Amino acid sequence: MLTTDAVLTVLRPVQDPELQKSLVELNMIRDVAIAGGTVSFTLVLTTPACPLREFIVEDCEKAVKTLPGVEKVEVKVTAETPQQKSLPDRQSVGQVKNIIAISSGKGGVGKSTVAVNVAVALAQTGAAVGLLDADIYGPNAPTMLGLSGAAVQVQNSPQGEVLEPVFNHGIKMVSMGFLIDPDQPVIWRGPMLNGIIRQFLYQVNWGALDYLIVDMPPGTGDAQLTLTQSVPMAGAVIVTTPQTVSLLDARRGLKMFQQMGVNVLGIVENMSYFIPPDLPDRQYDLFGSGGGEKASKELNVPLLGCVPLEIGLREGGDKGVPIVVSQPESASAKALTAIAKQIAGKVSMAALV
């Protein structure tokens, strides 16, 4: 006779491939029901962006079908993103579970392009995602998300004024670009910069978010210090190109996060090679090759992926439609989506270990 205990017993050896722990022990198997020869249950993953979802479901189905009398297995898949561990000297941001910095050692490496597309790719999996544009002196994210003319609404609350984030392509966002004229330069010293970043963290109605992606300014200055010293960080991602000078600066940025006690989730090599639109089967190493992989090995951090340079990637940023939306089957979009899923998996693993 089929019983719930019997189902859980055969599922107990099935492990989360990344956590290397039993799904049953992790409470990822819930709501087991038996109706004749049909066994159904809910599989609760640690992230909607789980890259190994199909493999886990397949392992569960195979395990349950070993029981005598089982004719059909129905698996409902949901996700509960774990909350990043809190720190006594850091202030959490409302209902935001995980804060992830996308950073670079120097400008011009496509950091904002990566941040925007990773945020949208995570939202496409069903996650609740926000994007904080912390590049105060050069806020480009509004343009890349098609929000150049948007305005932030201000609401009054018992805690003071609260900004309402702008929404597009499935994500919430705030940016200095919403608060100034397009041609207006931001000429601020450190204390003012720190103040606006803290306002974007604590005085924005973010609501419940699985991930808050922070598009950092280049370098290792006040903005990085403010973020890492204010909130518990789920991790940081370093964006570079294969070029030697870019890699040198990326190393400095990476070590800065490590010195601040922030987990570096990995390196993204952007502009890895160029794919000409008239010869899509060809690729040209405009900025060299192998730099990201070499830095990954030398610094002992993962290489999350390599993003090629395509015309569609640039056009998507200019038109305000990220390439993961406009051309999801392109090489760049596939690379960025895979990177987003890797980031989500590493963040969940760090929160549960």
Curated annotation (Swiss-Prot):
Keyword match DNA repair: no
Biological process, per Gene Ontology: iron-sulfur cluster assembly
Gene3D superfamilies associated with the record: Fe-S cluster assembly (FSCA), P-loop containing nucleotide triphosphate hydrolases
ATP-binding listed as a keyword: yes
This protein's UniProt keywords: ATP-binding, Hydrolase, Iron, Iron-sulfur, Metal-binding, Nucleotide-binding
GO molecular function, one term: 4 iron, 4 sulfur cluster binding
Superkingdom field: Bacteria
Pfam families: FeS_assembly_P, ParA
Annotated ATP binding sites: G105, K106, G107, G108, V109, G110, K111, S112
Classification via SUPFAM superfamilies: Fe-S cluster assembly (FSCA) domain-like, P-loop containing nucleoside triphosphate hydrolases
Functional summary from the UniProt entry: Binds and transfers iron-sulfur (Fe-S) clusters to target apoproteins. Can hydrolyze ATP.
HAMAP family: Mrp_NBP35 (MF_02040)
Subunit structure: Homodimer.
Family listed: In the N-terminal section; belongs to the MIP18 family. In the C-terminal section; belongs to the Mrp/NBP35 ATP-binding proteins family.
Protein name: Iron-sulfur cluster carrier protein
Species: Synechocystis sp. (strain ATCC 27184 / PCC 6803 / Kazusa)
Organism classification: Bacteria, Bacillati, Cyanobacteriota, Cyanophyceae, Synechococcales
